[in-house]
C-alpha cells in the first residue's frame, strides 16, 4: 500500500467499538506549587511575575520553587503528548483494519478477526510457521491461544517477500522449473478463500472458514524500507504530532492474505491412515471415514487442487476413553468413535488450464483403498441436486468472481479460463455420480474444458462449448 492510501488518518475518525486512553482521561500527579492564588483587587502586593512586580525583591527560594514547578509541568505535558501519540497510533491501526475486515454476513468469523487485532495491539504477535514453502503464521488471541492461520499474499511461495529461502534458491538456480504454469501466480490467498466458499455452497463442511483479511504485525516479513518508514512516522507522530497527523498511514502497512480458522484436535491424515491400516476400524466408524473422504474428493476435484497429499489434509478421531469411574456402575454409556476431516492448504487450486507440461499434480488420495469404493448414496443426495442445477453453478461462478476481482492483478480473461476448468470438473463429477463410479474412476476420466460460447446475437441464456484436453504432462504420476 503506497502513501496515497485512502485510509483515514487518526484524527479524522475513530471506531465506535474501541476506546483508548485519551489525554483528558489520564490521571497526572499533583504538582506542588502549581496552583496560583489570585489576590483581590487592592489587597496586598501583586503576585510574582505580575505587571509592576519587582522580580529582584522576590525571594530566591520562591524562584526555585517556581522553576521546579514549571519543569514538572513541562514533564507532565510531554508525558501527556506521548500518551496522545500512542493512542492515536492504536486508534489508527484498528481503524485501518476495521475499514477492510468487516464481515456482517459471518459475525462469528468477525469476532475471531477482532480478537486477532486486539492481540496484535497488545503486542501478542502472530508466530511464523516454519514448515511449508511460504510465509504463514499462527494468529493468537489476547490469551496467547492459536485461533487462526494467516497467509499473506506477498509471502506466498512465489511472492516477492517469501521468507523461505528454498523458493528463492529455486527461482535463482532453476528458473525454468519455477512455478506452476497452470496456476495464476500469487493468488494463493484467493484460492484458500475460494475453496472455503465452494465448501460452504456445497455444504461439505470440511474446510475451516477462510476469508480475505488485512493484518499488520511486527513478525511479518517486511522490506527494510517499510520498517524504516514506519519507525520514522511513529517518531514524527510522537515528537511533532501536527506533522505526524498528516500521514495517511501510521505504522507498518497491513498485508492482505487468507485468514483460516484454526481447528483443534486434528492430525495429519497420513498418521491416522497408517494407524487405521494397522488397527482396522469398526464397520460404523470406517463408514464415517468413507463419507468424510468422499467430501474431500468432491472438493478437491471441483477446484482442481494441484497440491493434495496425505500430509495436508487432517483427520480428527475422537474415540471413547476408558473411564475407570464407570467400571463399578451398573449403567455404562457406550459412545461410538467420531471421525471428521479438515481440508487445509488449498492455496494451489483453481488452475486456468489442466496440467499439461512437466507434472500432472495428481490427487494422492487416489491411491488409498477408500478411493476404490463407489460413491455412496449420501454424497449423491447431497451433491447431485446442486451441481446439476445450472442456476446453482452460475451463482457459484458469480460468487467466485466477486471474490477474485478483489486482487489488484485480477485479469478477467484468466478468470474465465479458471471457471472453464471448474465447469469441466463439475461435468465429469456429475457423470461419475450418476454412473455410480468410484473416486479412482473419476480421476481417470479425460479432462474437460467447458467455455462460454461467443455469440454475436444477444440471448437470455448462455451456450457453452465442450472440449477435451489431449496433451498430457511428461510425468503422469508426479
Swiss-Prot record:
Chain intervals for the UniProt region annotation (Activation loop): 343-363
Modified how: Ubiquitinated by ITCH; this does not lead to proteasomal degradation.
Location of the region described as Important for substrate binding in the Swiss-Prot/TrEMBL record: 156-158
Positions that bind ATP: 130-136, 151, 260-263, 345
GO BP of this protein: basophil degranulation; endosome organization; Golgi organization; phosphatidylinositol biosynthetic process; phosphatidylinositol phosphate biosynthetic process
Region (G-loop): 129-135
InterPro entries registered for this protein in UniProt: Lsb6/PI4K2, PI3/4_kinase_cat_dom
Database matches in PROSITE patterns: PI3_4_KINASE_3
Keywords, sorted A to Z: Acetylation, ATP-binding, Cell membrane, Cell projection, Cytoplasmic vesicle, Endosome, Golgi apparatus, Kinase, Lipid metabolism, Lipoprotein, Membrane, Mitochondrion, Nucleotide-binding, Palmitate, Phosphoprotein, Synapse, Synaptosome, Transferase, Ubl conjugation
Tissue-by-tissue expression: Detected in adult brain, especially in neurons in the cerebellum, brain cortex, dorsal root ganglion and spinal cord (at protein level).
Consequence of changing residue 60 to A: Reduces targeting to synaptic vesicles and neurite tips
Region Important for interaction with membranes, residue ranges: 164-177, 267-275, 358-367
Major site of localization recorded for this protein: Golgi
Subcellular location: Golgi apparatus, trans-Golgi network membrane; Membrane raft; Endosome; Endosome membrane
Record-stated family: Belongs to the PI3/PI4-kinase family. Type II PI4K subfamily.
Function description: Membrane-bound phosphatidylinositol-4 kinase (PI4-kinase) that catalyzes the phosphorylation of phosphatidylinositol (PI) to phosphatidylinositol 4-phosphate (PI4P), a lipid that plays important roles in endocytosis, Golgi function, protein sorting and membrane trafficking and is required for prolonged survival of neurons. Besides, phosphorylation of phosphatidylinositol (PI) to phosphatidylinositol 4-phosphate (PI4P) is the first committed step in the generation of phosphatidylinositol 4,5-bisphosphate (PIP2), a precursor of the second messenger inositol 1,4,5-trisphosphate (InsP3).
Subunit-level organization: Associates with the BLOC-1 and the AP-3 complexes; the BLOC-1 complex is required for optimal binding of PI4K2A to the AP-3 complex. Interacts with BLOC1S5 and DTNBP1. Interacts with FOS; this interaction may enhance phosphatidylinositol phosphorylation activity. Interacts with ITCH. Interacts with ATG9A.
Protein name: Phosphatidylinositol 4-kinase type 2-alpha
Biological source species: Rattus norvegicus (Rat)
Taxonomy of the source species: Eukaryota, Metazoa, Chordata, Craniata, Vertebrata
